[in-house]
């Protein structure tokens, strides 16, 4: 475990040094993280729809766990996927209201995490906040983002 931690630390430090050499200081500023959420089949309460959530850390450099947080009424399962790979039970926390992807790397804002929640019964009409963040890690930039998903009445 110590060897792996040492390797990850070395990789992080090497990336930071390389980045500081290659980029002029004016280009090294991170943008704010962004997140978007939309329903695919319907926006009406109590109907079934896929939900697509796209989170971009937009970091100059980040190394940590990407975390999606959902409000009451939304629950992730092992039928859902991130970037085309189905979620594992160990990635689904808090009764499906949190999805955590361990050890992710974003360099120069290149990473994008597309979470697809399959065939979800939409909750009652209202406005719901969905959040994305990089937690338990190191990095340069602001990683927190949230978006609103509006569910319409029937």
UniProtKB/Swiss-Prot annotation:
Q: Does the keyword Secreted apply?
A: yes
Subcellular compartments = Secreted
Q: Name one Pfam family in it.
A: BslA
Give the primary localization class.
secreted
User: Which UniProt keywords are listed?
Assistant: Secreted, Signal
Tell me, in a sentence or two, what this protein's role is. Has a minor role in biofilm architecture. May contribute to the surface hydrophobicity.
Q: How the protein assembles, per its UniProt entry?
A: Monomer in vitro.
NCBIfam families for this protein: hydrophobin_BslB
Q: What is this protein called?
A: Probable biofilm-surface layer protein B
Q: What is the species listed in this Swiss-Prot or TrEMBL entry? A: Bacillus subtilis (strain 168)
Instruction: List the taxonomic lineage.
Output: Bacteria, Bacillati, Bacillota, Bacilli, Bacillales
Coding gene?
bslB
